[in-house]
């Protein structure tokens, strides 16, 4: 039996949360090279967007589903918009962060973290983290991941 396109169980115009989250990851990843370059040149993580050399206002880095992208001590955190996105991810966040590794840096992606010192990050869960089920398998690192 042939299933016609109009028989699919999804509403017209409905976009899955994971597809919307991918925009947040792309926008956050867009800041990685600036953060890496700053770290390699200065030996410390950039404290904010301006020192990283990216848009000074976090709200200037935004998309259709993303409210803002913030750099804080080298941790790049993307926050979803409070409306116009899947209800399960409204206002929720994810982070990208790097750790030193053999003179270079290795990047991680997952639920929000905060940098406690040069080599350590801690979970920054406050009820505003994007549920792991909405994160792609490539973005499920934790603060403990090496």
Spans of features found by a protein language model:
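Amphipathic alpha-helical segments typified by the pilin-like N-terminal helix
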Residues: 1-38
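Periplasmic/extracellular, small/polar-rich flexible segments of pilin-like filament-forming proteins
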Residues: 40-146
């Amino acid at each position: 039996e042939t299933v016609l396109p109009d028989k699919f169980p999804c509403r017209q115009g409905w976009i899955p949360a994971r597809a919307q989250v991918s925009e947040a990851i792309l926008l956050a990843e867009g800041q990685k090279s600036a953060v890496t370059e700053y770290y390699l040149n200065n030996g410390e993580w950039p404290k904010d967007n301006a020192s990283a050399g990216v848009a000074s206002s976090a709200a200037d880095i935004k998309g259709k589903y993303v409210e803002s992208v913030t750099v804080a001590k080298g941790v790049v955190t993307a926050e979803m918009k409070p409306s116009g996105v899947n209800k399960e991810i409204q206002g929720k966040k994810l982070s990208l962060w790097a750790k030193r590794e053999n003179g270079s840096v290795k990047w991680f992606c997952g639920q929000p973290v905060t940098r406690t010192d040069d080599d350590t990050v801690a979970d920054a869960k406050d009820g505003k983290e994007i549920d792991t089920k909405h994160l792609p398998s490539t973005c499920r690192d934790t603060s403990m991941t090496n």
